[in-house]
A protein has these predicted regions:
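Short, well-ordered helical secondary-structure segments
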Residues: 5, 97-99, 170, 176
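C-terminal helix-coil-helix/basic helical segment that borders enzyme active sites and/or dimer interfaces
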Residues: 136, 152-191
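Glycine-rich beta->alpha junctions and the first turn(s) of the following alpha-helix
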Residues: 32, 41, 47-52, 56-153
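Short, charged low-complexity intrinsically disordered segments located at boundaries
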Residues: 149-158, 205-210
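Short, conserved alpha-helical segments within structured domains
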Residues: 140, 144-147, 168-171, 194
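Glycine-rich phosphate/cofactor-binding loops in nucleotide/flavin-utilizing enzymes
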Residues: 1-38, 50, 87, 183-217
C-alpha cells in the first residue's frame, strides 16, 4: 500500500495545518482506525471518502458501517469532525477481515503532529516577537528563546523515533504543552492559538494503540 511518509505529512501540516496533514495521510490509507468506542476525528467532510474503518478486533468496510457525526467544541476550529462508527447490523466485527491501519500510516500521523507543533511554534515565535516587556520584545529574553530552542530540539528527536512511533507520540504530548505555554494565557483558551495542539493529541488518542498492543483509547 502506498502511504504518505512522515516527512510529507510533516510538511503538509506545517504549511497548511492539522487537517491538511491528515488529508495527506488519509488520501492513501485503506482503513481509518477508531477508538474502542468507534470514534474518530477526520478532516471535515472526509468520512464519505473512507473505504473502511478499523475497529478494535477487525475492519469494517464502508458499505457495512453506520457513521454518525457528533458536535465537538474544538474540532470545527481546526476543520475537523468527530464521527462514531458502528456496524449496520448487530454482529461482531470479524478479526483480520480486512486491511489493518498500516504502521507506515501511524508513522505518517507522527509527522502530522510534528508539523502541527512546528506550525504552532512558528506562530508562538511571532506572538512573542510582537509583545514587549521592559521596553524590549519578549523574543529577545533568555527564557523564551531557551523554551523555543528546547521545543525545536524535542521535535527533531520525535522525528528521529521512526522505529518506535508510539514512544514519539507520548513524548510529543509534553512538547505540545510547552509550546502552548509560549502563548501565555491565550494558549489555554478554547479556540485559541494552541487549539490545533490539543486536537492533534486527541486525533492520536483515537488513531494509535495505547498501553500495549491490542488496547485502544
Amino acid at each position: 500500500m502506498s502511504t504518505a511518509t512522515l516527512d510529507e505529512a510533516r510538511a503538509a501540516a506545517r504549511s497548511a495545518g492539522l487537517a491538511a496533514g491528515l488529508r495527506r495521510v488519509l488520501a492513501r490509507s485503506t482503513a481509518v482506525p477508531c477508538s474502542a468506542g468507534g470514534r474518530a476525528f477526520l478532516p471535515a467532510g472526509w468520512s464519505g471518502n473512507v473505504p473502511a474503518w478499523h475497529l478494535p478486533g477487525g475492519t469494517l468496510p464502508r458499505a457495512d458501517a453506520r457513521v454518525r457525526r457528533h458536535l465537538h467544541p474544538l474540532a470545527g476550529t481546526c476543520d475537523l469532525e468527530l464521527v462514531e462508527v458502528s456496524p449496520l447490523v448487530c454482529t461482531a466485527v470479524a478479526p483480520h477481515d480486512g486491511p489493518d491501519f498500516c504502521p507506515a500510516d501511524e508513522l505518517a500521523l507522527l509527522g502530522v503532529r510534528i508539523g502541527t507543533a512546528e506550525r504552532a511554534l512558528d506562530q508562538a515565535t511571532e506572538h512573542l516577537a510582537g509583545r514587549t516587556s521592559g521596553g524590549a520584545p519578549m523574543i529577545r529574553y533568555q527564557l523564551p528563546r531557551a523554551a523555543i530552542a528546547d521545543a525545536v530540539t524535542e521535535l527533531e528527536l520525535c522525528a528521529a523515533y521512526r522505529s518506535c512511533p508510539a514512544d514519539a507520540h507520548d513524548r510529543l504530548c509534553g512538547v505540545e504543552q510547552s509550546i502552548a505555554g509560549l502563548f501565555g494565557g491565550s494558549g489555554y483558551l478554547c479556540a485559541g492559538p494552541a487549539t490545533s495542539l490539543y486536537m492533534a493529541a486527541l486525533v492520536a488518542s483515537t488513531w494509535t494503540p495505547v498501553n500495549g498492543p491490542g488496547r485502544w483509547s
